[in-house]
A protein has these predicted regions:
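Short glycine/proline- and aromatic-enriched beta-strand/turn motifs that initiate or cap beta-hairpins
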Residues: 24-76, 100, 186-190
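Residues that define the transmembrane beta-barrel architecture of outer-membrane proteins
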Residues: 37-41, 52-56, 89-95, 111, ...
């Protein structure tokens, strides 16, 4: 019995194309003059705690429709490097562009899954514990780490999670943080 694999592949391709077309049309409508009238502001404050990293961030964006938000993220971060003579804290300020996608559960939209994707850069402001005094000759030496004050580090971050709407537009959210600089969890509040 000969199986025809063309039909399932063609059907899957048509479904994928139509889904992409529907999403593209939805985004196009959101950016139209009529769609921009429905935009709403969205602000969040979040804390990140991870393995060898911690920090906080503030996001400000525009909810272009009920499922999507685009905006800017700014934060203060501390990354910890293990070095020969202990630990070095790398302090930085970061800025990023982000997009958020909501997957609402139920008509009242009290519970939602979300996915944040951010692309940004962190400016290294300070190194703590990077210098030590050699007891033999009394000379101050720098630890062998790959970053220095004034460096810019680019990063990509993905933060999926669960959002719970508490009162009107006040909501809490929690989820993992998967980033090129941090692996951990985040907890925040948004309005």
């Amino acid at each position: 019995m000969k199986k025809n694999v063309f039909k399932p592949i063609a059907c899957a391709a048509i479904m994928l194309f139509s889904l992409t077309s529907v999403q593209a049309q939805s985004i196009k409508e959101s950016f139209s003059a009529e769609g921009r009238k429905n935009w709403k502001s969205e602000v969040t404050v979040r804390g990140n705690l991870g393995i060898y990293a911690s920090g906080f961030a503030v996001t400000g964006g525009v909810r272009i429709d009920e499922k999507r938000t685009l905006g800017l993220m700014a934060g203060k971060n501390v990354n910890v490097y293990t070095v020969t003579h202990g630990y070095t804290d790398v302090n930085s300020f970061s800025a990023a562009l982000y997009g958020r996608r909501y997957f609402h559960l139920g008509e009242r939209k009290i519970f939602s899954f979300y996915s944040d994707l951010a692309l940004g850069a962190a400016f290294v402001t300070d190194l703590e514990g990077a210098y030590w005094v050699d007891p033999v000759d009394g000379v101050t030496k720098k630890e062998d780490i790959s970053v220095d004050k004034g460096d810019v580090q680019f990063y990509i971050s993905w933060q999926p999670g669960v959002r719970v709407r508490c009162y009107k537009n006040l909501h809490l959210f929690l989820g993992p943080t998967l980033s090129s600089h941090c692996l951990g969890v985040h907890l925040g509040i948004g309005f």
